[in-house]
Amino acid sequence: MTHVPLVDLRAAYRPIRQQVSDAFDAIFDKMGLFLGDNVQSFESEFTEYCQADFGLGCSSGTDAATLALEAFDFKPGFEAIVPAHTFFATIESVVHAGGVPVMVDIDPKTYCMDPERVESAITRQTAVVMPVHIYGQPADMDPIVRMARDHKLKVVEDAAQAHGARYKGRPAGSLADAAAFSFYFTKNLGALGEAGFVTAKDEKVLERMKLLRHHGHHSKFEHTLIGYNMRIDELQAAVLRAKLPGLDANNAQRRRIAARYNEAFSELDMVTPYAAPYAEHNYHCYVIQTDRRDELSHHLSECNIGTGIHYKTPAHRQPALRSVPHRAMPLEVTESLCARCLTLPCYPELTDQQIEHVIDSVGRFFGP
């Protein structure tokens, strides 16, 4: 029986394995492991790719989001408006930066922060709005940014899943005051482990990010801020440099696979992903909705097909928040999605045989 894993990291690395091996050899010969030539080159290349003003590599997506928030030096106890449907790292970054997460509901089609839910969540303590480009679908940024400007708030993109995604022709990472990316190894642009990236519009914000990233280290013997160890290393930067040139082609293949799925599943009793007309989705995750999620997941497992759930427990119901200040607005759409969502394999290395196996297996589950 054809095997279709949810992700296939071996296949993803096959085209660049020799290039990465050669780059690693050069790094080992030189033994400059942090903030060296590969880091500096990748920072320049990815900043240009995002059409951002400034950019900085760091150790993970969670650290990137934390850096992006801390760089603005908000007052302790500031409120950050975030979508309730997101990976928990979005919430963690707010808490780590000394803030209070305020969770709002999502748009029922895009699954991103619903701009119409934001204004009612704003209080005198609100400092920042943090839309998440969930699954690789850009949030509707223009109304969010306008609303933030009207209330003198900052906007930080959580672009952890949005490498190469575009909003009205503009790349994720260039749409707000700052943005945070994750290069976790399963991402569309993934490291060989962990890494992250922040972009910013203001050079002063970037300089504060640099200090925070490296222990507040201003000169050899001087630390001007209480910072962190959030550096990206040369090995991860070398991997990302090897992968970046293929990102657009890989995203295009994800869109082609998603289109095949959408057509094949159009008559079935399920909801397929919606790509907003203003967005160029990168399909980091191909997420469907069905009332029979657990049954379908079990059936696909029997067919040797991997699935996932992104995400089963809404952020506002996580036990970690019981002792942490937070607010949750009405979240009916989030609750419904978390009860019904299922992720199917959708990545550029899938073969035609694997794609057809997924299509046939899903079709057999729902019947004629």
Regions found by a protein language model. Name each.
Residues 174-211, 217, 234-237:
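Active-site PLP attachment segment
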Residues 70-159, 166:
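PLP-dependent aminotransferase-like
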Residues 10, 38-45, 49-55, 116, ...:
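PLP-dependent aminotransferase class I/II
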Residues 31-79, 93-97, 103-105, 170:
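Phosphate-binding glycine-rich loop
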Residues 56, 81, 102, 155-156, ...:
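Structural detector of well-ordered beta-strand residues that form the stable sheet scaffold
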